Each structure stands twice: as structure tokens, then as C-alpha cells.
Amino acid sequence: MDIKHILSMVDHTLLKPETTWEQIKGICDDAMKYHTATVCIPASYVARCKAYMQDRADKVGVCTVIGFPTGYSTTEVKVFEAADAIKNGADEVDMVINIGMLKDGRDDEVLAEINAIKKACAGHTLKVIIETCLLTEEEKIRMCDIVSKSDADFIKTSTGFSTAGATFADVALMKAHMTNGKGIKAAGGIASIADAEKFIEPGATRLGTSRIVKIIKNEEASGY
């Protein structure tokens, strides 16, 4: 698979709590050099990141996260976070569902929350993180149905901050049950170009990772 095609599907991600501005600038530079889909960064850096890339011909999208990583903020707080992120220049928003709400069987409320957040970032891409490692197969299928019915643009496997990240089986399950042309983002544990290819094969259309760009940089430095 063409490496440029893989890179075009990558949200080049840095969400560690100790992240500094120098590190953010570094991933922006890498993302622009290698033409990734976006940089995915903490909301507190969105405005500075957008300004940093503003006059660059090879700028990429800015993605951030809300309700992250637990998802149990109130809907009102998540809506505010989304609106604030868009105001500051975010092009894409990745939200975490209220997992307890899903497990309680309150599917209509999960759907309503997604749509309220999408309304707050209308005209911009919304991805819905369902944290697959905490869900049963039945719950994953229900979330596929909810996201398919919603106004969101993508379903996403994982935050990368829970007990496990994306699996090939989960991406295949999403591909089998998603409808309405929604995208599928795999995130968490994508450690190599081979991993990326294996997630794309069953249906991933976006990849959340920082490692692929690092691997390519290391190969270039080694003369490969």
C-alpha cells in the first residue's frame, strides 16, 4: 500500500497530559511535511496550532478531543467544549460517549448527545469515540446503529487512554454494521506501517497514531 495514501489517512496525534508547545510545533511540522489528514492535539493548543500553520501552503487540519478521555462530562459541558474548539479554529472534533449511559440502555440519550455536539460544530467533522475495550459485542453493535443514525461523521474505536486500543476485529465489526456512509477511525496501538495496512484492510478510513510518522522519519535518517 502506498505510504502517501496511508499518511493521508492519519490524524497525527499528541494528547499526553505533559504535552508542551514545542512538542505541538514539532508534530505540526511533521504533519505538514508528510501531509497527514490532521494533527490531533489538546484543546488548549488549538488556537496557537491554527495560527502556527495559518500561512503555510502545506497546512493540515486541526483536530481536538472533548469529554476526553472518560466521556462522563455532562452533555452541556461537551457542547461548550465543542463550540469553544470550533471558535478557536478546530476543523475536527473527537468526542467520547457517556459509556455508563450506553450500558444503562439509554440509547436515545446517547444519540441526542451526539447530535447536540454535532450542532455545536456544524460544518465541521465530528468523530464519536466509543471505547471498544469497555464494551460488549452487543454494545458495540448498538453504538454502530446509534452513530449511523446520528449526524456525526465517524465512529472511532478508542481514546488510547483506557485498557486497550483498536483491534482488527472491532474495525471489521464496525464495517459490517455501520451505514449511511460514516467513516471508521481506528486509534490506540497502531505501531507500524504494517499495523496501519491491517486496519485499513477491514475498513478503517482514518487512523489515530503518532508512531507512523516517527517510523518514516527514522527510516529517512537511516538512509532507507
Question: What positions do the PLM features span?
Answer:
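Alpha/beta catalytic cores of nucleotide-metabolism and tRNA/nucleoside-modifying enzymes
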Residues: 1-29, 116, 173-184, 190-224
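Active-site mouth loops of central-metabolism enzymes
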Residues: 5-21, 63-78, 100-106, 127-139, ...
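Structural motif
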Residues: 34, 88, 120-121, 146, ...
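Active-site cofactor/substrate anionic-group-binding motifs, chiefly glycine-
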Residues: 37-44, 48-92
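Catalytic cores of alpha/beta
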Residues: 50, 70-84, 135-146, 169, ...
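Glycine-rich phosphate-binding active-site loops on the catalytic face of alpha/beta enzymes
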Residues: 64-68, 87-102, 149-165, 186-224
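Conserved anion-binding
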Residues: 77, 82, 92-152
